[in-house]
Design a protein with these regions (language model features):
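Intrinsically disordered, low-complexity Ser/Thr/Gly-rich stretches
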Residues: 1-175
């Protein structure tokens, strides 16, 4: 998971994706025990934006320790998805955001099953784009596929007691 010259829009110096300024990475310390995660992973984010519509993407990543072959560690994408803000509460009744207002969105990843081995890290990457995997959101609120312009969205993920953004991992207890 490192940019390179083959990446659309990437420029030197190439960096790990988690270190990009448009990616917010949450990562555990190295795990002290094997940890099994099996089922749907749910992410609840409190977010705000300068735009009336925008996207939030999440990736669950198994971060292997550094090795001779991978001096920065190996970063295995397990599952990822996207949530368009206008559809945060309903696919049939879209609702635009009010710029600057905090709202809670729920992002559910497809079911997965992985044993994060001792010494590995669990990482969740949050961004507003995962192009070309998902289409680009013009952030205008215009009808999907019929936009006439694009605007930049400055997005914020809020944390803390008033805005408890969180990840719900289905951890299977060791036997």
């Amino acid at each position: 998971q490192k940019e390179g010259p083959e990446w659309i829009g990437a420029e030197e110096p190439y960096q790990l994706l988690k270190d990009r300024p448009d990616v917010l990475a949450f990562e555990t310390d190295p795990l002290e025990n094997d940890t099994e995660v099996t089922g749907e992973v749910m992410i609840k984010l409190w977010v705000s934006s300068t735009a009336v519509d925008t996207d939030f993407t999440v990736k669950l990543v198994d971060v292997y320790p550094a090795s001779e072959d991978y001096p920065e560690g190996y970063h295995l994408n397990l599952v990822d998805t996207i949530q368009r803000a206008r559809y945060r509460d309903s696919w049939t009744e879209p609702e635009m955001m009010t710029p600057g207002e905090s709202v809670e969105i729920t992002i559910t990843l497809w079911p997965t099953s992985n044993v994060f081995k001792k010494g590995h890290r669990i990482r969740l990457d949050v961004s507003s784009s995962n192009f070309p995997r998902f289409d680009v959101n013009p952030n205008t609120g215009e009808p999907v596929g019929r936009h006439t312009r694009m605007v930049k969205a400055d997005n914020t993920v809020h944390t803390g007691a008033e805005h408890p953004s969180r990840v719900v991992l289905p951890v299977i207890p060791a036997e």
